[in-house]
């Protein structure tokens, strides 16, 4: 019984290691995708957004 428990534990560790090595299965299309522009206004647009919005969210009424 003890050998069976040890065998199951070793198998679980090996399967876990295999999943970590394989990663999350990124497809080539995902890796080569063009990053989305979160700031289409450039630096000026980002600065104006900060001035317009409230930088301290919990304290804004």
Curated annotation (Swiss-Prot):
Keyword check for Zinc = no
Q: Write the signal peptide boundaries.
A: 1-23
| Record key words, sorted | Amidation, D-amino acid, Disulfide bond, Hydroxylation, Ion channel impairing toxin, Neurotoxin, Secreted, Signal, Toxin
Name the tissues where it is expressed: Expressed by the venom duct.
Q: What is its main location?
A: secreted
PTM 4-hydroxyproline: list the residues: 58
* UniProt remark on domains: The cysteine framework is C-C.
**Protein name in UniProt:** Contryphan-Li2
């Amino acid at each position: 019984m003890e050998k069976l428990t040890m065998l199951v534990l070793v198998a679980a560790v090996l399967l876990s290691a295999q999943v970590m090595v394989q990663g999350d299965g990124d497809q080539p299309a995902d890796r080569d995708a063009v990053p989305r522009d979160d700031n289409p206004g450039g630096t000026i647009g980002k600065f104006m957004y900060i001035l317009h919005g409230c930088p301290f969210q919990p304290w804004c009424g």
